[in-house]
Swiss-Prot record:
Binding residues annotated for L-ornithine, in chain numbering: 162, 224, 228-229
NCBIfam families: orni_carb_tr, PRK00779.1
Residues bound to carbamoyl phosphate: 52-55, 79, 103, 130-133, 264-265, 292
InterPro entries hit by this protein: Asp/Orn_carbamoyltranf_P-bd (IPR006132), Asp/Orn_carbamoylTrfase (IPR006130), Asp/Orn_carbamoylTrfase_sf (IPR036901), Asp_carbamoyltransf_Asp/Orn-bd (IPR006131), Orn/put_carbamltrans (IPR002292), OTCase_ArgI (IPR024904)
Protein name (Swiss-Prot/TrEMBL): Ornithine carbamoyltransferase
HAMAP family the record matches: OTCase (MF_01109)
The encoding gene: argF
Xref: Gene3D superfamilies: Aspartate/ornithine carbamoyltransferase
Record function comment: Reversibly catalyzes the transfer of the carbamoyl group from carbamoyl phosphate (CP) to the N(epsilon) atom of ornithine (ORN) to produce L-citrulline.
Classification via Pfam families: OTCace, OTCace_N
Keywords: Amino-acid biosynthesis, Arginine biosynthesis, Cytoplasm, Transferase
Length: 308
């Protein structure tokens, strides 16, 4: 049974396959073929412990466009909120649904869900990884640059978070140079070690730096909120630590005119990014958000073993 818990478990050619399927789905969509009913009448369970806009809606839209129905659930709506085990829950859900997409606080929850599931489990965000976002990021950069391999991308700010981690993973699979630009207390050198085998195969490079000048010459400048869900108690300390890493027009000028601006959203305007940048001519965030839907379709099709 193939799951999508992280992209680390996927080989480089499998990541490329997902992105090519995504591009094909988007081309069909843009040509007016919105409805591609590959899985008519099937059910996708969305299990969300955290609130969501893009992830929930993109998965719901993707399921509908493939002929499926998405059923949204939260812990308080299921017996799991009253003590039923994850194991028992997944054994039951596997009899009803074709796949489960789960947005959870702890990555270990996803691992346990997958352990007892006989249907694909998809990571819709955990504290450690956000693979659906990384696929949309890669598709967006491919569209904007015209290249899938050999890109240079700088992630600026909280380089320890799930979005930065998944960006590094997809970059390692595609032979990118990923520059993780942020304060030293947030560096995770273990990540580079974990991706060493893929980097050796693809010729990619990942490194940490605290210099904002390292955004020079990149294809994309990426940032995310300074205070992620679950870190509210550390809000003031994180804002103090990350204040020097705001993406403003000066940063984009250093990056150069070729660079596009990326943000997974929601954005805290005036903190990690200025209005001038996110609403500016180099911003690709709205294409990036749309691409969440097309890459979600690709993930469903890939894991359920059927392509358009």
């Amino acid at each position: 049974m193939k799951h999508l818990l992280t992209l680390m478990e996927f080989k480089p050619h499998e990541v490329e396959d997902l992105l090519r399927i995504s591009r094909d789905f988007k081309a069909r969509y843009m040509a007016g073929e919105v409805y591609t009913p590959l899985f008519p009448g099937r059910i996708v369970m969305l299990y969300f412990e955290k609130p969501s806009t893009r992830t929930r809606l993109s998965l719901t839209a993707a399921a509908a466009q493939l002929g499926m129905q998405a059923v949204y659930t939260a812990p308080g709506e299921l017996q799991i909120g009253r003590g039923e085990t994850i194991a028992d829950t997944m054994r039951v859900v596997s009899r009803y649904a074709a796949a489960v997409a789960a947005r959870v606080y702890k990555h270990e929850t996803l691992e346990e869900m997958a352990r007892y599931s006989s249907i694909p489990v998809i990571n819709a965000l955990s504290d450690r990884h956000h693979p659906l976002q990384a696929l949309a990021d890669a598709l967006t950069l491919w569209e904007r640059s015209g290249r899938l391999h050999g890109l240079k991308v700088a992630f600026v700010g909280d380089v320890s978070n799930n979005v930065a981690t998944s960006l590094a993973v997809v970059g390692a699979k595609l032979g990118w140079e990923v520059r993780l630009v942020g304060p030293k207390p947030l560096w995770n050198q273990k990540l580079v070690e974990e991706l060493a085998e893929d980097l050796a195969k693809t010729g990619g490079q990942i490194y940490f730096t605290d210099s904002m000048n390292e955004v020079a010459g990149v294809d994309g400048v990426y940032t995310d909120v300074w205070v992620s869900m679950g870190f509210e108690k550390e809000a003031e300390e994180r804002r103090r630590l990350l204040k020097p890493y705001q993406v403003n027009q000066r940063v984009m000028d250093i990056a150069g005119k070729r660079a596009v601006f990326l943000h997974c959203l929601p954005a805290h305007r005036g903190e990690e990014v200025t209005d001038e940048v996110i609403d500016g001519p180099q911003s690709a965030v709205w294409d990036q958000a749309e691409n969440r839907m097309h890459t979600a379709k690709a993930v469903f099709a890939y894991l359920l073993n059927k392509r358009a």
